[in-house]
Amino acid sequence: MSNQYGDKNLKIFSLNSNPELAKEIADIVGVQLGKCSVTRFSDGEVQINIEESIRGCDCYIIQSTSDPVNEHIMELLIMVDALKRASAKTINIVIPYYGYARQDRKARSREPITAKLFANLLETAGATRVIALDLHAPQIQGFFDIPIDHLMGVPILGEYFEGKNLEDIVIVSPDHGGVTRARKLADRLKAPIAIIDKRRPRPNVAEVMNIVGNIEGKTAILIDDIIDTAGTITLAANALVENGAKEVYACCTHPVLSGPAVERINNSTIKELVVTNSIKLPEEKKIERFKQLSVGPLLAEAIIRVHEQQSVSYLFS
């Protein structure tokens, strides 16, 4: 830690989902990580102890609700309750990856809206603010009745690709839902966009990938918010090459990379996969064509600005 933050009432706590990111954020802010322990009883119940006074402090909890999702959610809820009962002044949840975000609406009858339920649980536990990164659905902000700052990963990804000095690029959205995200990256890189339109011509027939936009002879950059099993992104990359793209890069904010994702990426035409560290990944998933960027500086700056009651809006771009 190279600098010391002046206000001792700012406390940053780490739980178990991403301790390396939490330590990086604390170092950038200029504070020591708050003293707490997260353990399990013999039956698996979560036990949290806060090992310093936080009375009257502004507390920030760094916790991605990634795999194991439900374990990390329970840790977070119990930590919020512990801070509330210890008389914290404010309890700010920093969620680099918001689990259950894809369950943001009723796609079919009798389905839950679990993204809303999670928001309710955080508020009921005692959270006073949320700092989130690249929510799968922006409308999740409306699920909260407390302030929420929604940061974007596109500037981080865009800065990386600017530094590569790639020529004749095109930004590609792998589906209709990601067009806005692709447009933001395209505007930053001053590049055109293309869209992959997946259609099933008739029942029981495989989907056909139609590419809307010119990708012939260009370097394509696929962008998504989440790469989970990597089926969509790898099929899209293969379709781009088959239709004349010179080479394909892929990027996302949240590398869930579950199931066959790593194998699919290794077997695909993707030259490089660029992600952030919003989710902690085991070493076996850090494959050769994998580049991980840090969201630590962005989240640290957001924490400082929230604590000092400064504007956070410029971080959105």
UniProtKB/Swiss-Prot annotation:
It is found in: Cytoplasm. ATP binds at residues 43-45, 102-103. Its EC number is 2.7.6.1. Changing residue 204 to A: 4.5-fold decrease in the affinity binding for ATP. Slight decrease of the Vmax value. Mg(2+) 1 binds at residue 136. The keyword S-adenosyl-L-methionine does not apply. Its cofactor is Mg(2+). GO terms for biological process: 5-phosphoribose 1-diphosphate biosynthetic process; purine nucleotide biosynthetic process; ribonucleoside monophosphate biosynthetic process. Signal peptide: none annotated. PROSITE patterns: PRPP_SYNTHASE (PS00114). Optimum pH is 8-8.5. Activities at pH 7 and pH 9.5 are 35% and 85% of the maximal activity, respectively. Changing residue 207 to A: 2.5-fold decrease in the affinity binding for ATP. Slight decrease of the Vmax value. It catalyses: D-ribose 5-phosphate + ATP = 5-phospho-alpha-D-ribose 1-diphosphate + AMP + H(+). This enzyme uses a steady state ordered mechanism, where Mg(2+) binds first, followed by Mg-ATP and lastly, ribose 5-phosphate. PANTHER family: RIBOSE-PHOSPHATE DIPHOSPHOKINASE FAMILY MEMBER (PTHR10210), RIBOSE-PHOSPHATE PYROPHOSPHOKINASE 1, CHLOROPLASTIC (PTHR10210:SF41). This is Ribose-phosphate pyrophosphokinase.
